[in-house]
Amino acid sequence: MKAWQCAAAGGQDDLALLEVPAPLPRPGEVLVRVRAAALNFSDLLMLRGVYQVRPRPPFVPGQEIAGVVAGDGALWRRGARVAGKVFWGGFAEEVAVREDMLFGLPDDVPFEEGAALPVIWPTAWIALHDRARLSAGETVLIHAGAGGVGSAALQLARAAGARVFATAGGPDKAALCQELGAAAVFDTGSGPWLEPLMRLTDGRGVDVVFDPVGGETTDQSVKALARNGRLLIVGFAGGAIPAIKANRLLLKNASALGVYWSHDTDAPLVEHALAEVLALRAAGSIRLMVSQRHAFADLRKALVALQERRTVGKSVVTLP
């Protein structure tokens, strides 16, 4: 089979499209013929050897896939349409996947959209509904609202009845956030966002901040919290892991909440989150934002675009 293999921890330049043996499923796994695979910022970190999951080179990256089960397993039968998360190995024609990490893909959900589901949508749903306990009528600030997980969180917050603000880098990304329902969008390329946000909330701040960026953004986000506010720590796409000033949380009676899940510890919650997301999609309340579709052979170009912040929503590569 063909697969994109990383020979050394250095980045996408170390990727090569090679002919490699198909993986052999272990007990509890099935082989999936990949029809689409989604890109994540964590793929870039894994290629550089700085992600918390560090496979030994040579390895095949890729953590979100959708496709067709190639052989019968304990839970899945040959021909089933599925999507799921893998630790790595997704940028290949076939991948062995733990059966409990797959979910059935409805017939009306294209493989490209299915590949965009397994990571960002449960993350956004769990952050807002399980960790922050978001209620209708509350105010939410979504950082990087045009990105993959940001655009998911923006839509889920709107669907929950919240008033949503967003930050975005550039006018095109800001326009997308407005299209998705943000009440106001702050273009981070045009100046600071904290003061305008505080004006729009009459100095109160927001009930929830969804932060996948980290660094200085997190420090400013603590200042943006209202009393009893919740800061959701989703990731560090900006590259810097922040130190949160606990005295500011204390004075606002606020909380900083980490957002991390796994199938080993949170399987029922993840299953519930995915069911809720698919129901919202079926009702027309959200869109699974696949904004960039690339041929499998163009994976390297797609990763460069992601690294250079030239993408909105999700990027996927497709296979015949």
Predicted segment positions?
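NAD(P)H cofactor-binding loop motif with strongest signal on the N-terminal glycine-rich segment
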Residues: 144-145, 213, 236
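Short helix-loop-beta connector
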Residues: 107-110, 133-139, 203-204
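Short amphipathic alpha-helix with an adjacent loop that forms part of the alpha/beta core around
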Residues: 193-203
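Mid-domain Rossmann-like dinucleotide-binding core that forms the NAD(H)/NADP(H) cofactor-binding site
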Residues: 115-191
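Glycine-rich beta-strand-centered segment in the early N-terminal region that forms part
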Residues: 21-38, 50-89, 108
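C-terminal capping/lid region of NAD(P)-dependent oxidoreductase domains
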Residues: 1, 283-290, 300-320
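Glycine-rich phosphate-binding loop and adjacent beta-alpha segment
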Residues: 216-286, 319-320
